[in-house]
Structure formats: structure tokens, C-alpha cells
Amino acid sequence: MEELTLEAFIRGEWIDIGIISFPKSSQHNFRVTELNYLSDYALEHHDKDDFHAVSLNHPVSFFFDDMGKPGWLKFLDDIMPSGASRRYWVKHLDIEDLSSDEQDYVLLKFGTMSPIGNLRVKDSLPERYEVADNLYFSVDDVKNRAGDFLDYAQQRGAAAGGATGAGGEAPKLILRCGFDHGSGSEKIWIDPYQDDNSNHDLHYLVKYPRGSRSTIDCNILRAEFYFYHELTEMGVETISTDGMRLEEGLNYPSLWLPRFDVQIN
């Protein structure tokens, strides 16, 4: 039986909270899933359905209850690659020939290192290399390379998968942005581990035009930038516009949204 370890970011650190199991995987059935919280974790946080739990539907408990409906745990759809990110991973892992259920398992195991939110699959974390920890890119790299940035980053030795945690049809990247005082310019980097609370570099979700990236697609993305500012002026609670930016690349614009799920102390 295949199993994956689930982690949660709680009070400033990643901790193991449970095991996702595939009880029928020996029969090549990856659609049936179960979640069992770790015993010590369940003892400390029993019955909590807040950020300690994987979802409201699965509060922390000692035993898994499928409510008489065995199958796919819906919260997994929220953390595994989807949309443009899924297409990248399916191609990158060369799993086009697998069934969608088998693809889901492989994507959970290898591509769920940095989803939006406070959950991740521990098995997805790449081996740590010094070159990847000290690899920086320019803003021009991100805004001009657009969809090719991941391949470019991978070729240079970065753990590019750490930038793929956002779902949706529009291509998106999860990046960090800081300032290099030596060169006097901004530095962009990929943070697949998200484990250094002393680093205050900004967290961004960088969004590119969806579809065929036509003039209309590009203008829709540009309009989104201004809509956020108008909503903020009207007093509507939305993504913070502090640090939000609209960058014009050689071919397409990119919208840099501050991460709403990350708080830097």
C-alpha cells in the first residue's frame, strides 16, 4: 500500500500531521484514499477543525471515517498541481500515458511541495543542494521568459518545482523577491522549502495571461491589477495592493500579487 506524509505549517514550523494512504494501490487503484492523523498529533489537537486540520470535513481525529463513501479526499484537489501547473508537471515527469488517477498519485508524491496554504506533501520536497539555495534570477528573467522561466530555472540548477504551487488555467509562479545590496538590484528566487522564518524577502504569486495570450488576454490581466486598486479604494477587502506590481515583459505582461497566505513577522 502506497503512503505519503502530510505536513502542516503551524506556529512557524513544518510538522508531520498525518499519513495519506492508498489502500487499493496494489490493484492500481489510486482513487480510494484515506487520511490518518498521527497519534501524538491527534492526542494534542483532537476534534480541532481549524488550521490544525486538513479541512472542515476532516477534523483532527484518532480514526479515519469515510462516512460510508470511500474514494478521493477532496482536500487533495486543493493542494496538488492543477491547471497550467498540472500540465507542466505531467510533461516534466513524463506521465502522459498514465491514467488520471495514477497521475494524481504521482503529482501528489513529486509535485506538491509548495501549494498555496499551510499544507504540503513531505515526500515532494527535493533534495537540498547548495547551488539551488544560492541561485538568484532577475526581474527581467521572470517577466521576459514567461512560460519558459521554469525550464530556464531548472537548467540553471534551481528546484523549479517549488514555483508551481498555484493552480488555475492561467500560468502562475510562486517566487520570492528581495534586494541585492551588492548589485543594487532586485533578486528573484525559488523557495521550495519555506523554512527560514528569518528571511523577510517578499512572497509573490506571479500571474501571466491565460489562453492564447492574445491582446484581449493580456488586457484582461492588466485590468485585474487596476480592479484590485479600485476595490481597495472602495473599502472592499481583497488582496493587499502594497507591493502589487504590473510588469510589462517583451511579449506579455505579468501581474505580481503579494501572497495572501503568508505572513512575515
Where are the model-predicted features located?
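Phosphate/dinucleotide-binding and metal-coordinating scaffold of catalytic cores
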Residues: 1-265
